[in-house]
Amino acid sequence: TMLTLLEHGTDDQKERFLKPLLNGEKRICYSMTEKAAGADATGMQTKAELDGDEWVINGEKWFSSSASVADIALVMAKTDPEAPRHEQYSTFLVELPDPGYQILRNIETMQPHTDLGLKLGGSHSEITIENLRVPRENLLGGRGQGFNMGQHRLAYGRLRHGMHNVAMAQRALDLAAGHVVQRETFGKRLADRQGVRWMMADCAAEIYKARLMLLHIAYKAEKGMDLRQENGIAKVFLANMVHQVVDTAIQLHGALGYSHDTPLARWYTGIRSQRLVDGPDEVHRWRTGANIIKAYEKHGTTASACGGELFE
């Protein structure tokens, strides 16, 4: 979210909003998702109308992460309903608290919350926006640019999620290795059993593939190359990879892994969200498949849709 402000904010917006964020003085949230729209961002119904020198925003938002602790919100709303589909939306910088931006509730999920976690990162909030007045100069990135900015932000968010998933998977495998080298059953270490080694080898292969995917995408991002196809493929792979590795680590720990004596059980419930956030698996797979067909029809090969253009 801060990267969006860095890349699209005016000098004044960066001074007023980005600088205190970078200094750790304030926190920010992103209010895009709506109940009725879900993964279809173009289905959003929150509207913003220009009234003199202010925009007036009305609507509802859903699963706005960290809204309960935020001092600033990026709010996406429909400003141009008659424009082409992807040019109907704009993004606004909102200073919080504001009576027009109210948290209805913090949404309970399958991942248990801790007091420290709520204090540091807040929760996922349901928001009602009623006659929220925003100064005209708080429009971010230009009118009609909200959708494209949002997709750009999500692309980098998927990269960050992927890094987190690799780190968690690596740590889970570390915990599993630490357990199997000490645990003995029937007079033999678990680490010396062929089946256990196969399980750990499979995890290592998945982590290795995930790392290479991330490095390739990061390279393309640094070079300003189009990374949408690879990012979609990797998003699905990494979300399922971390689930598989953590699940294997739990299995290798036995009942201990199912308990809260290790962090594995907590991680397991938390990572289920990875197959939903920033686009569910099915949407990414659908788009990936469409791009494969498009590549073949254009080039006579699917290579460009499968990471074939590794470096340019």
Regions found by a protein language model. Name each.
Residues 1-2:
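Well-ordered alpha-helical segments within folded domains of soluble proteins
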Residues 225, 232-312:
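Alpha-helix capping/hinge segments and adjacent helical runs
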